[in-house]
Design a protein with these regions (language model features):
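Short alpha-helix plus adjacent loop in nuclease-associated cores
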Residues: 112-133
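Conserved G1/Walker A P-loop phosphate-binding module
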Residues: 5-14, 24, 146-212
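A charged, well-structured terminal subsegment
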Residues: 133, 137-151
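Short hinge/gating elements
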Residues: 18-23, 57-61, 115-122, 157-172
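N-terminal accessory targeting/assembly segments
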Residues: 1-114
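Conserved hydrophobic/aromatic pocket- or pore-lining residues that grip, position, or stack substrates
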Residues: 84, 136, 175
Length: 212
């Protein structure tokens, strides 16, 4: 049986990154980082440093320039931080490029952080299923070595590599399978809710008939 992965943010020391670009002023980015810090704390992270970078253009490889990317990785290492959170949304390629700079430091963005918070606060079976589905659909195109070895978190049938499969291919297969199963589970929940609604309606009609 495949189980939902545990939180990878809770109790981590975090390094926040904000970018001054376009119409965004330094003060506005500072406000965004204040919000991001609150979100990180809500997820259980301990923010130890905030970094702001002014850009004339977005770098397609790292969002910020490659030199600055290496710099924040080195700063994070010096602070013994394993989690860097960007206020801006990163592309799958940018996530992959950061993972190539360091396997020991995980780089995520605001969207991933918010999904983590939703996951922690989901109470009902349906809410937990919806959040896990959203997390995995977000993760799939961004899957890199930083996300690998999912069999430790999602153990069960189908975790072994087939002929010629790399570990990351196994991980992607695991995620796709889990996404498919979660969608089926949500369909089942919807059908059960509809059946319950119809039953309540019929019971109401029967009860009403008893009074007439």
């Amino acid at each position: 049986m495949i189980e939902k992965k545990e939180s990878t943010i809770s109790t981590e020391d975090a390094f926040l990154v904000g970018v001054v670009f376009g119409n965004l002023s330094s003060s506005k980015v500072s406000e965004h980082l204040e919000e991001l810090e609150l979100l990180a704390k809500t997820a259980g992270a301990n923010v130890v440093h905030r970094y702001t970078q002014k850009l004339n253009r977005i770098n397609p490889s790292f969002f910020i320039g490659p030199g600055k990317a290496q710099l924040i990785i080195e700063q994070a290492k010096s602070l013994d931080v394993k989690l860097i959170i960007f206020d801006d949304e990163l592309s799958p390629a940018q996530i992959k490029n950061f993972s190539n700079l360091s396997n020991s430091i995980k780089v995520i963005d605001r969207s991933s952080l918010i999904l983590e918070i939703f996951s922690q606060h989901a109470k009902t079976k349906e809410a937990k299923t919806q959040v896990e589905l959203a997390q995995l659909e977000y993760m799939l195109p961004r899957l890199t070595r930083a996300w690998t070895h999912l069999e430790r978190q999602m153990g069960g049938i189908g975790t072994r590599a087939g002929a010629g499969e790399t570990q990351i291919e196994v991980d992607r297969r695991l995620v796709r399978t889990r996404i498919s199963n979660l969608k089926k589970e949500l369909d089942k929940i919807d059908k059960e809710r509809e059946t319950q609604r119809k039953n309540r309606k019929e019971n109401y009609k029967v009860a009403l008939a008893g009074y007439t």
